[in-house]
A protein has these predicted regions:
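Conserved PLP-binding active-site segment in aminotransferase class I/II-type PLP enzymes
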Residues: 1-75, 96-97
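PLP-dependent aminotransferase-like
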Residues: 68-104
Length: 104
């Protein structure tokens, strides 16, 4: 029995879309991203969606959304529980907003 260490996870349809977007020369903040954000928001039943470049950016944007929300659920100096073992990108956005890290 053979188990490959890796395999291609992209189908022909996905590859064609990648090529189309790359061929336009603008694959960040372009029309394709705008369409995806709108379709994603519709699919999950929300008003707006925001596509970001990485999980690290998603952490930062999500934290900013909580920090600047009208009822301000997070304030500078608040304590946030975080895992002791994680990536630096878990911690940096929290420190950037002046939150205190509590490692578990």
């Amino acid at each position: 029995m053979f188990y490959p260490l890796s395999s291609n996870t992209w189908g022909e349809e996905e590859v064609a879309v990648f090529q189309e977007v790359l061929g336009k020369g603008r694959f960040t903040m372009g029309e394709s991203v705008k369409k995806f954000e709108s379709a994603f928001a519709d699919k999950i039943g929300i008003k707006n969606a925001l596509m970001v470049s990485s999980g690290s950016m998603a952490n930062l944007v999500g934290l900013a959304a909580l920090f600047y929300k009208k009822n301000n659920p997070l304030k500078r100096g608040d304590e946030v529980i975080v895992p002791s073992i994680s990536w630096a990108t878990t911690y940096y956005p929290l420190q950037q907003y002046g939150l205190k890290l509590k490692f578990l």
